[in-house]
From Swiss-Prot:
Record's catalysed reaction(s): uridine(2552) in 23S rRNA + S-adenosyl-L-methionine = 2'-O-methyluridine(2552) in 23S rRNA + S-adenosyl-L-homocysteine + H(+)
Entries under NCBIfam families matching the protein: PRK11188.1
Recorded superkingdom: Bacteria
List of residues binding S-adenosyl-L-methionine: 63, 65, 83, 99, 124
Subcellular location: Cytoplasm
Pfam families (alphabetical): FtsJ
Entry's family note: Belongs to the class I-like SAM-binding methyltransferase superfamily. RNA methyltransferase RlmE family.
MF annotations from Gene Ontology: rRNA (uridine-2'-O-)-methyltransferase activity
Major localisation: cytoplasm
Top enzyme category: transferase
Species assigned in the record: Shewanella woodyi (strain ATCC 51908 / MS32)
One GO term describing the cellular component: cytoplasm
Entry's EC annotation: 2.1.1.166
This protein's name: Ribosomal RNA large subunit methyltransferase E
C-alpha cells in the first residue's frame, strides 16, 4: 500500500511540476530553476543587489539565484556561489562545489571572498528532506545558522541578507538572532513559492557590526 501511495504522490508532484506556471516561465526565460523568480520578487520589493556589489550565494545549484544576482551586480560586481551539488558554469560567477557544513569548504569560500567585505549574502540552502519533521527541521535550522554565521564573518556594514527558513521549531529564536544583527528584518513569501510549502524568506537589511 505504501508503495502505491508513494507512486501516486510522485505522479501528483510530477504533474504539478510540469504544469507549474513558474517552471514553464523559467524555461522560456532561460532560468535554470523556478527559484530565480523568488529572488527576483525579493529584489523587486527590497532592492538588495545593485551594480558593483559583491554577492555570496549559498545553496546555489542549479544556478537560478546566481543568474539573477550576476545580472544585477553587473560587470563591476562579483558573485561567489557555493553548493554541495555541481553547477554548470555561469559567466561572472565564481563557483565552489563543496559541503558548506565542512570547515575546509568554509575556509575555501572565505579565501575566494578575500579581504574585501561582501554586500549581500543569499541563502537558498535546504537539507535533503526525509519527510520527518523532527529530523528535517533541525537540519534546516542548522543550515540557516551557518548562513547567519557567514554574515558575521564577511558582511559589510549595512549589508543585506536573504535566507530561506522553514517555519517550525527554532524559527522564532532564529528570527530574534537575525533581528539582533540587522536594523530591519522582513518576512517574505514570494508568489513563486508553492503555497503548501512551509518556506519563507527573511530579508534583512542594515547589518550592524
Amino acid at each position: 500500500m505504501s508503495g502505491k501511495k508513494r507512486t501516486a504522490s510522485s505522479s501528483r508532484w510530477m504533474q504539478e511540476h510540469f504544469d507549474d506556471h513558474y517552471v514553464k516561465l523559467a524555461q522560456k526565460r532561460g532560468f535554470r530553476s523556478r527559484a530565480a523568480f523568488k529572488i527576483e520578487e525579493i529584489q523587486e520589493k527590497d532592492k538588495l543587489i545593485r551594480p558593483g556589489m559583491t554577492v555570496v550565494d549559498l545553496g546555489a545549484a542549479p544556478g537560478g539565484w546566481s543568474q539573477v544576482a550576476v545580472k544585477l551586480a553587473g560587470d563591476n560586481g562579483k558573485v561567489i556561489a557555493c553548493d554541495i551539488l555541481p553547477m554548470d558554469p555561469i559567466v561572472g560567477v565564481d563557483f565552489l562545489q563543496g559541503d558548506f557544513r565542512e570547515e575546509k569548504v568554509l575556509d575555501a569560500l572565505l579565501t575566494r571572498v578575500g579581504d574585501a567585505k561582501v554586500d549581500v549574502v543569499l541563502s537558498d540552502m535546504a537539507p535533503n528532506m526525509s519527510g520527518t519533521g523532527g529530523v528535517d527541521q533541525p537540519r534546516a535550522m542548522y543550515l540557516v545558522e551557518l548562513a547567519l554565521d557567514m554574515c558575521h564573518q564577511v558582511l559589510a556594514p549595512n549589508g543585506c541578507f536573504a535566507v530561506k527558513v522553514f517555519q517550525g521549531e527554532g524559527f522564532e529564536e532564529y528570527m530574534k538572532s537575525v533581528r539582533e544583527a540587522f536594523k530591519t528584518v522582513k518576512t517574505r513569501k514570494p508568489d513563486s513559492s508553492r503555497p503548501r510549502s512551509r518556506e519563507v524568506y527573511l530579508v534583512a537589511t542594515g547589518y550592524k557590526l
